[in-house]
């Protein structure tokens, strides 16, 4: 009997499984339909209610998706079963009911047709039928009803949103600004008084700074970058070559061994011309000349022998050297301006002159005042440029001018020779440029430039720039330019978005350019519009970001960009695709992994009672605990080695091998060494098999450093190594 029951269940396994699935799907559909009916609001009365309804219905959307997926899978199984039944039925009929069998009789007089037997037909009649009604699919009407309810709810919400938009048009300017600032707060975007759609005023010129010193990005990557910058509203580039320019003749040794070739730069500048960019080369002519003065052949021009930071302006050789540097760079760029086939614009040359820390210290310069030495040198360089290239305007950094009196600035006539570029990278511009200083500048210069930052300003060794801080810096500059621009007869020339690669020639790398792309595109799109647009359809940022999800806060109920807390982890940039996105997202993973390992090492070494420096000096610890403390170390080591190889692969198409190696050595290698030391320390402590009685010997170094009073007691000392 049991055997018969088992056979019966086995023959009807498909029917039973389909019947069970049907019962389950009916239950799921009924539950989901009730949930949907209860949670979908019929109308929305405000933006807040829309957001709340969207958040409440997120779970229902997920449930409906699962239900529709189950229905779809069941329909596929059912369709497959129907096709199989049809195929078996056709095969049976073709093999068992041959009414067309042809044979010759013995007389050869005709054809005999063999009829199907009654037994064969009864077998076909007894074959079980598919457990469906007709040829329709399971729950197709219910699935369509779910989709219809979803679309009805979306249409209702969009109609109410359109009604709210129409009502917003009747709001006052103050009310619209209040709504705008409220949405900025939800996004985590800094709210700056006076900046919004009603008062939008973009800077006339918007230049992006390319700092190439010591880390030359490949031209192929830079050409891709140009296309992105153009689409976001950039009008030009401030290019700082330093040792990456292909100098010639007496200056050949200034170029790094991995400097650009002239053909590469020509290709790049021609691409700049195609995009209609203006070019402003940045050539340091006073401070930050380490790349030249570090070399023995140019060391005699230093202001003081021990520091290559600043050049001595009192030596004639210094001026000859600077003139040749300027001549080679200016002539190289102007050849593209003079060619009729290009549209490269070059109207300004930046001569640096910031942070001149070594000034008036040599025997030749000490006889003059610092301010006078600075002004005289700047005027001499500017006069050389204006004498040879009258079409070029000279720009300098402003920080050395800030402490000077108004009288000194006016009597020097520096306003006739240069345009200052006022640089502040913090979130409080007026803390560095007071209203009084603005007034002084306005009485000396007819026009000025402003300089913000998108990277390289909040830490000399960061891996990823703090986007929110850089965005606030740029928005505050927009407010300052709107307020202070009227002081100058020609207003502000424009805003430069600086992106420093190193704090100076001897410093290690700041954030690499691909890791700073989110900061760059966010700040550039904002300054190009004059404010941060909260509407994703109107924000140019989304022109260059491709997402698998639709960044629309009205549909999801969540802001399409969120910069709260750790701004590095905005979903928009950690999930979407754009130029450099793979390395940016890798940097986030690397940052988190390094933080995890540092915390691990802190616990097993610094805060450990068994692997501390004391334990190591005295070789005194518990082997069992040491083994437990170091068991994760090999795993972490392997993870970092894997991340190093991944970094090399991701950066291969962006930088040369030297820059890649420097990044790995700077960010990953120190932690690898710390893990290796942890393993070595554990091995040393684990080799001990016998330990001394307490008290342990006192370290001799404590007496040598006079940290303890020496006593006459006979104490066995142990030397600290």
Please report, for each region that a protein language model flagged, where it lies by residue.
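Short, low-complexity, Lys/Arg-enriched N-terminal segments of secretory-pathway carbohydrate enzymes
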Residues: 1-13, 44-61, 67-68, 74, ...
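N-terminal signal-anchor transmembrane helix specifying type II single-pass membrane topology
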Residues: 2-47
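Substrate-binding groove of N-acetylhexosamine-processing glycoside hydrolases
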Residues: 3, 12-18, 113, 137-142, ...
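Feature activates predominantly on carbohydrate-active enzymes
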Residues: 32-41, 121-154, 158-387, 395
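Residues marking helix boundaries in flexible regions
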Residues: 48-51, 72, 78, 86, ...
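Proteolytic processing junctions in secreted/extracellular precursors
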Residues: 53, 72, 86, 115, ...
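N-terminal secretory targeting and juxtamembrane "stalk" segments of secreted and cell-surface proteins
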Residues: 64, 70, 106-109, 144
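Intrinsically disordered, low-complexity, serine/threonine- and charge-rich segments
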Residues: 82-87, 96, 102, 112, ...
């Amino acid at each position: 009997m049991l055997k018969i029951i088992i056979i019966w269940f086995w023959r009807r396994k498909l029917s039973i499984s389909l019947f069970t699935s049907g019962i389950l799907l009916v239950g799921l559909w009924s539950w989901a339909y009730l949930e949907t009916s209860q949670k979908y609001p019929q109308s929305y009365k405000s933006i807040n209610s829309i957001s709340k309804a969207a958040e409440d219905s997120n779970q229902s959307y997920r449930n409906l998706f699962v239900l529709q997926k189950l229905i779809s899978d069941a329909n596929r199984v059912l369709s497959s079963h129907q096709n199989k039944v049809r195929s078996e039925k056709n095969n049976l009929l073709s093999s068992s009911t041959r009414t067309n069998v042809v044979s010759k009789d013995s007389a050869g007089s005709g054809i005999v047709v063999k009829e199907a037997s009654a037994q064969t037909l009864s077998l076909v009649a007894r074959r079980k039928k598919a457990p469906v009604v007709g040829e329709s699919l399971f729950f197709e009407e219910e699935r369509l009803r779910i989709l219809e309810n979803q679309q009805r709810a979306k249409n209702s919400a969009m109609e109410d949103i359109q009604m709210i938009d129409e009502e917003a048009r009747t709001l006052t300017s103050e009310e619209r600004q209040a709504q705008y600032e409220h949405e900025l707060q939800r996004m985590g975007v800094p709210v700056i008084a006076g900046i919004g759609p009603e008062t939008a005023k973009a800077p006339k010129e918007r230049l992006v700074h390319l700092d190439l010193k010591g880390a030359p990005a490949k031209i192929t990557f830079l050409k891709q970058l140009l296309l992105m910058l153009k689409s976001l509203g950039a009008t030009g580039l401030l290019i700082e070559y330093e040792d990456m320019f292909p100098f010639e003749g007496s200056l050949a040794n200034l170029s790094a061994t991995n400097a650009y070739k002239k053909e590469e730069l020509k290709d790049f500048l021609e691409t700049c011309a195609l995009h209609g960019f203006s070019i402003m080369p940045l050539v340091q002519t006073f401070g930050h000349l380490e790349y030249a003065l570090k070399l023995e052949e140019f060391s005699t021009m230093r202001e003081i022998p021990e520091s290559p930071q600043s050049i001595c302006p009192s030596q004639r050789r210094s001026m000859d050297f600077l003139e040749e540097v300027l001549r080679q760079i200016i002539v190289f760029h102007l050849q593209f301006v003079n060619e009729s086939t290009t549209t490269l614009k070059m109207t300004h040359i930046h001569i640096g002159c910031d942070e001149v820390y070594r000034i008036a210290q040599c025997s030749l310069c000490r006889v003059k005042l610092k301010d006078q030495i600075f002004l005289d040198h700047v005027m001499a360089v500017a006069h050389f440029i204006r004498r040879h290239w009258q079409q070029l305007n000279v720009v300098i950094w402003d920080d050395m001018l800030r402490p000077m009196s108004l009288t000194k600035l006016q009597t020097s006539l520096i306003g006739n020779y240069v345009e200052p570029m006022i640089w502040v990278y913090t979130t409080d511009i007026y803390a560095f440029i007071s209203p009084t200083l603005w007034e002084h500048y306005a009485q000396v210069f007819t026009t000025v430039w402003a300089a913000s930052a998108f990277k390289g300003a909040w830490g000399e060794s960061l891996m990823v720039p703090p986007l929110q801080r850089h965005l606030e810096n740029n928005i505050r500059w927009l407010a300052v330019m709107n307020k202070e621009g009227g002081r100058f007869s020609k207003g502000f020339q424009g805003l430069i978005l600086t992106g420093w690669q190193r704090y100076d020639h001897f410093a290690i790398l700041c954030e690499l350019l691909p890791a700073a792309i989110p900061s760059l595109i966010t700040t550039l799109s904002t300054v190009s519009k004059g404010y941060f647009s909260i509407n994703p359809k109107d924000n140019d940022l989304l022109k260059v970001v491709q997402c698998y999800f639709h960044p629309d806060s009205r549909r999801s109920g969540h802001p399409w960009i969120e910069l709260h807390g750790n701004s590095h982890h905005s979903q928009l940039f950690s999930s979407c695709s754009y130029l450099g996105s793979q390395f940016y997202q890798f940097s986030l993973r690397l940052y988190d992994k390094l933080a995890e390992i540092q915390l691990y090492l802190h616990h097993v070494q610094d805060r450990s009672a068994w692997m501390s420096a004391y334990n190591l000096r005295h070789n005194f610890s518990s082997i069992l605990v040491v083994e437990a403390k170091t068991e994760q170390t090999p795993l972490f080591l392997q993870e970092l080695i894997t991340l190093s190889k991944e970094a090399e692969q991701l950066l291969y198409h962006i930088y040369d091998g030297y820059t890649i190696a420097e990044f790995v050595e700077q960010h990953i290698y120190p932690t690898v060494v710390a893990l290796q030391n942890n393993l070595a320390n554990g091995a040393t402590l684990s080799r001990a098999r016998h330990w001394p009685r307490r008290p342990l010997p006192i370290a001799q170094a404590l007496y040598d450093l006079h940290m303890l009073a020496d006593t006459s007691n006979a104490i066995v000392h142990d030397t600290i190594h």
